[in-house]
Amino acid sequence: MTRITKLCVLLLSSIGLLAAAQNQTETGWPLHDDGLTTDVQWDHYSFKVHGERIFVFSGEFHYWRIPVPGLWRDILEKIKAAGFTTFAFYSSWAWHAPNNHTVDFSTGARDITPIFELAKELGMYIIVRPGPYINAEASAGGFPLWLTTGDYGTLRNNDSRYTEAWKPYFEKMTEITSRYQITNGHNTFCYQIENEYGDQWLSDPSERVPNETAIAYMELLESSARENGILVPFTANDPNMNAMAWSRDWSNAGGNVDVVGLDSYPSCWTCDVSQCTSTNGEYVAYQVVEYYDYFLDFSPTMPSFMPEFQGGSYNPWAGPEGGCGDDTGVDFVNLFYRWNIAQRVTAMSLYMLYGGTNWGAIAAPVTATSYDYSSPISEDRSISSKYYETKLLSLFTRSARDLTMTDLIGNGTQYTNNTAVKAYELRNPTTNAGFYVTLHEDSTVGTNEAFSLRVNTSAGNLIVPRLGGSIRLNGHQSKIIVTDFTFGSETLLYSTAEVLTYAVIDKKPTLVLWVPTDESGEFAVKGAKSGSVVSKCQSCPAINFHQQGGNLIVGFTQSQGMSVVQIDNDIRVVLLDRTAAYKFWAPALTEDPLVPEDEAVVLIQGPYLVRSASLEKSTLAIKGDSINETAVEIFAPENVKTITWNGKQLKTSKSSYGSLKATIAAPASIQLPAFTSWKVNDSLPERLPTYDASGPAWVDANHMTTANPSKPATLPVLYADEYGFHNGVRLWRGYFNGTASGVFLNVQGGSAFGFSAYLNGHFLGSYLGNASIEQANQTFLFPNNITHPTTQNTLLVIHDDTGHDETTGALNPRGILEARLLPSDTTNNSTSPEFTHWRIAGTAGGESNLDPVRGAWNEDGLYAERVGWHLPGFDDSTWSSVSSSSSLSFTGATVKFFRTTIPLDIPRGLDVSISFVLGTPDNAPNAYRAQLFVNGYQYGRFNPYIGNQVVFPVPVGVLDYTGENTIGVAVWAQTEDGAGITVDWKVNYVADSSLDVSGLETGELRPGWSAERLKFA
């Protein structure tokens, strides 16, 4: 009762404050727009697009984590196929700005216009999230690393240096987006300002003390976006429920956006759940979070919006191989996403829906190469149970129009006859449609509970099911029980089976319901009198019909498979168990993301994936994927005479109830060639006294001051970013005269970093790294007779960092914080010798962006990379051959580069996914770091001493599926024991597919070697 009273007070106050300036909805809540367009509006209930309410079910993908534009279609088609109305993406400033005078939105995978065009073609809205800061477990949170020196201030504020830095990128990104807004007939419907920037207040938000610096920064971004053509609403995402930032409903402070949202990861955003206790409290599996009161307090006149809700978790360096998918698997999907509906959330974007790969130097130190994120679409682009489980809800929310406008009427166990089960009652105030979200009273409990439910319907108050039996929650599950649900011109009075979707075909409705396998369901169709079973799954028991009070009640138990019931008034009801529902599809025959029922869908049962369908005259063209021979059944208009699957006509038969049946053939099998011959060369000549470091690969490290707020303990400044070298491996050569007994080094490189040291070609030792240590010091004592008392000595430090920290840590330096020589005679208080000078080498060309296609992330400073051994076309004919193909091994502390070429000839008409598998042979040393290169792309960081990732998916486009492939492996042994590594690859899946990956034009993504590289030796 307290909540209802509070809601009324808020409603009255909002009307009083806003009625003069805003339109009113049917219930009195103010209807907002941004003053620039009414194409997008919103109120307490939901977003409206072109005047129609929409349940925004969205998912995130990052185009820069899959740098093959031809595969963006694959990801977006899979998002659309699952029933999502929307997708979201971060754009990455770092990806588009390799240096402070370049903004590139045209080269290779930097041209983002195909994303907008695909959204229009496929029929999905877009939430654009341009940063400039994005977090995203990306190095420096997506900032270009040239920004991290301190020369641009402390960042994320109104400092003019920082402002002038972000403007070129932000203005170009905004200008491109402005052409693809909903106001221009395209599909961008909101634009996020910054990211998880909850800094509006200087202290506790309840005290309302403005942070004028943060406000000025937000206003600069908002002004820039408007000046460069953005007309759609601005959004912002609070990082947690404590920030209370940027809501017009909460305060009239500056910087507020149009619609605010909340990011939430109730099961922790990382597989290491201890990292989330400061935000979430102690981790308790399946513990849901109350959001209703938060939104009612913070943003009552806006839709309850979650710009990021947990779609999975990233895997930290020491996390398990393959991630922690069980933590956010099908039970998490089923329970938590329905729980959000119980909390009146009508706009929700899953982070991530497709994660991708931290290829090159994308990653922040918190994670390794994989960014699979345990997402519904896996890193290798496959789909499985989590994707299908998500589809069960997203198809429902797309079809449940009345769900976009509901009030929370009540909640508790009083709705059920089982105190272990509670329900949340949502009701549409206009249509009186009801949605009862049921779950365990204690969400952490996964017991098998049977119950009946008290519901309010247009036929009165009922207890359902009515014909006996029960509703069941078996495990960590939730069910949404609907009442007075409209499908076409008909009304579902109630259903204890969940609604999957419906279609109006030839002006006749087909309703699709599902239950978990072997569970029962009951539904009542208003005004219907009779029904019959026209198809029943093989092991399903009888389906019962009962006419009561002018309505037809149908009771059933659904074993594995599909049943079909025909009801008078030309109503068809399809009954599915969970396994059949997983493979049930509703491709839209329209580009409208709202999928109006008069433009409708067709319904298809059976395939692994249905990407799309189109109808022309009497031919229904279906595009999709099959991974084995599959029986399919299609519910389509009566005039359909021909069905094609990926352009090939299917032999069909017609069922007695009007569906069409066919069989899709299995795809061809694929056998990958074996790696049989490798070449090898030494990739650390810099350790040798004879090496000449005077070439253009090297830069004097001679800065005696730094703008970085973290000052070094010794000079010169040995921060790699100061000298234009930003990624991974950097090499430092320090010179001194006379003798010394050793050196003390303090190096900072992020979690899991490491370094090794050599004096005059002699190996001194290594710091091997630790998944939780970002900075380490080491004292290396010099062996006798290694130093040259009368000539110059050279210390080489090879240092590997794992990216820049996120948020306020972006400026944390990478490099040597302290370097001190130890005196040779400690008994006579002799003066410590000093380094005379230092030089540094890193990525070939530094910030010059020598390889604009692969980009600034791709390469480190290893000799092999600088001179281009990893690139296609390099001549390795003079190299030594490896004696064994089973293991690439050597002794001694150095870096070796192994190289081979191998052909592929993948047939047309298939989608094929391939992963590399790296390992360490039994009893071989594991104190090494390896990098996998595929046709010039660094697509794997393998660190068996610290990490557990061994499988590295590599997409087509990086791999050449119809030609020669150059594979390279750089192996850095950090002890004299050397290293041994195994390299293999595997097929993840083969599908007969409309995607046809071998037909993608990707040659321009793999530029080859040129002699220009030799100058960086």
Curated annotation (Swiss-Prot):
Disulfide-bonded cysteines: C271-C324
- PANTHER family cross-referenced by the UniProt entry: BETA-GALACTOSIDASE RELATED
Task: Report the Pfam families cross-referenced here.
Answer: BetaGal_ABD2 (PF13364), BetaGal_dom2 (PF10435), BetaGal_dom3 (PF13363), Glyco_hydro_35 (PF01301)
InterPro entries linked: Betagal_dom2 (IPR018954), Betagal_dom2_sf (IPR037110), BetaGal_dom3 (IPR025972), BetaGal_dom3_sf (IPR036833), BetaGal_jelly_roll_dom (IPR025300), Galactose-bd-like_sf (IPR008979), Gly_Hdrlase_35_cat (IPR031330), Glycoside_Hdrlase_35 (IPR001944)
Q: Where in the cell is it found?
A: Secreted
Q: Where does substrate bind?
A: Y90, N135, A136, E137, N195, Y265, Y373
- One MF term from GO for this chain? beta-galactosidase activity
Q: Active-site residues?
A: E196, E308
Q: Single Gene Ontology BP term?
A: polysaccharide catabolic process
Query: Which function does this protein serve?
Result: Cleaves beta-linked terminal galactosyl residues from gangliosides, glycoproteins, and glycosaminoglycans.
Glycosylation positions in this chain = 23, 100, 158, 211, 411, 417, 456, 628, 681, 737, 770, 777, 785, 828-829
**What protein name applies here?**
Probable beta-galactosidase B
- Sorted alphabetically, which keywords does the UniProt record give? Carbohydrate metabolism, Disulfide bond, Glycoprotein, Glycosidase, Hydrolase, Polysaccharide degradation, Secreted, Signal
What reaction(s) does this enzyme catalyze? Hydrolysis of terminal non-reducing beta-D-galactose residues in beta-D-galactosides
Where is it chiefly localized? secreted
Q: Which residues form the signal peptide?
A: 1-20
Q: Which family does it belong to?
A: Belongs to the glycosyl hydrolase 35 family.
